[in-house]
Amino acid sequence: KMIDAIIKRDEELKTRPISAIVVAPGCLPKAFPKEDGASMVRVEMAYGKCYAALALGRDSSLVKVRHEESPSFTSFLIKTSGGKLFPEGGGMQIRDSDGEVIGAIGVTGDTETVDQELALHGIRSAGLKTDADFEGKGRKFAIRRTKAEDGR
């Protein structure tokens, strides 16, 4: 359902051809279509965004900010993950109504902003939640933001 909604929205926005992937906890792929015309390694890039989101417990766009602030930190994580972690926006954790992380979604193919919008659209279309829905709801759901992420 999430992937279908993403592809439909992608067609409405007339974006570049995309790849999207939904993974279970542990980053086990569940669905990963690649639109005709999407360039090589798009599925791997979308997977890397999911990996980043699950590995650090935050949207991959925030992992990108962390990478810009401290390249040595994320370089270590990229190396430790065997190159699986991709610190670019478009990967989001998927949460159920209780806030439990039940997987992640990654989208790639257009701008970071569009990829992020499509990932969010997919999650919302399935009636599921994101990290943002649980901000300020206690330590279990806490996402500690850096100064740059807070806009300070």
Which residues does each PLM region occupy?
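Flexible, solvent-exposed loop/hinge segments and secondary-structure transition points
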Residues: 1-152
